[in-house]
Amino acid sequence: MASSVISSAAVATRTNVAQASMVAPFNGLKSAVSFPVSSKQNLDITSIASNGGRVQCMQVWPPYGKKKYETLSYLPDLTDEQLLKEIEYLLNKGWVPCLEFETEHGFVYREYHASPRYYDGRYWTMWKLPMFGCTDATQVLGELQEAKKAYPNAWIRIIGFDNVRQVQCISFIAYKPPGF
């Protein structure tokens, strides 16, 4: 046992001396020529664009004449297929879908006070009841079509409610009135 302690101490002393001379100075990035080339050409956007290319593709949200409403509101209007995917996502998470609509202001506004209050555009009218037990995204889309027919000039959003934690987990605009 004593011999193993002595040998490990000797090894530790030897590696400390060797490590100091093994570190090479940094000489910058290596050229791409020295790396092996794979036979598979990966042509997705993440492999083609460099970091600088991605920065040049970014755009700034125009602040004039456009309002930001909810999650995904900066994107073009979602198609029915895209809405179905979003609804399926919230159903797969076990959340309860619910529709809400607003006929006057689809965005947060201050009417009675400069600081946030109860009546400042964050509370919308619920369409019917939350869809407890719903497992089919097309049912939610059908309710959206009914709400659009009943209120064609209203903003309609879909929320996902977690009834265990009692919180709203997802909310996105599903329909905007014409002209918005």
Swiss-Prot record:
Record family assignment: Belongs to the RuBisCO small chain family.
Pfam (any one): RuBisCO_small
Subunit structure: Heterohexadecamer of 8 large and 8 small subunits.
Transit peptide: 1-56
SUPFAM superfamilies: RuBisCO, small subunit
Keyword annotations from UniProtKB, A to Z: Calvin cycle, Carbon dioxide fixation, Chloroplast, Photorespiration, Photosynthesis, Plastid, Transit peptide
Name of the protein this chain belongs to: Ribulose bisphosphate carboxylase small subunit, chloroplastic 1
Record lineage: Eukaryota, Viridiplantae, Streptophyta, Embryophyta, Tracheophyta
CDD domains cross-referenced by the UniProt entry: RuBisCO_small
Stated role: RuBisCO catalyzes two reactions: the carboxylation of D-ribulose 1,5-bisphosphate, the primary event in carbon dioxide fixation, as well as the oxidative fragmentation of the pentose substrate. Both reactions occur simultaneously and in competition at the same active site. Although the small subunit is not catalytic it is essential for maximal activity.
Single GO MF annotation: ribulose-bisphosphate carboxylase activity
SMART domains, alphabetized: RuBisCO_small
Species assigned in the record: Petunia hybrida (Petunia)
GO cellular component terms attached to this protein's record: chloroplast
Extra remark beyond the main annotation: The basic functional RuBisCO is composed of a large chain homodimer in a 'head-to-tail' conformation. In form I RuBisCO this homodimer is arranged in a barrel-like tetramer with the small subunits forming a tetrameric 'cap' on each end of the 'barrel'.
Compartments, record wording: Plastid, Chloroplast
Example GO BP: photorespiration
Keyword Cell membrane among UniProt keywords: no
Major localization listed first in the record, in broad terms: plastid
Signal sequence residues: none
The keyword Transit peptide appears for this protein: yes
